[in-house]
């Protein structure tokens, strides 16, 4: 969703409807239609797609809470999203079709197992997600140091400092 938004400068207010096609296994796992809790939001493709199109960080744990899943702008867009079974998809693939109010249609097919073509962007996203998840467990300073060490891993003699930091 975020890639389509960037590529076509999509304004969510001009979206008529969105269809997401995935294999039935993902429908069983990540298809909570109207999440009520933050945890349910994490398992709702409709909710996370709406967040992404609205520019929200879907990798940030703090964005999955009861207030966010009830946020009017997100709910309004979420309710225009339909997730359907598409057995032509691979196990980690999704196809998205965004129909705009002006009649134009934007489509993308992605595989979440495929690395981002922009490795710097991928590193930034993964680092931010790690800091968000590890910070509360081992402390922000230690988490930041782990990211720093992993960034220079090819020059490391061993992993002793990384493992020590991760122990908390």
What are the functions of these language-model segments?
Residues 1-168:
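Terminal-appendage/accessory-domain detector
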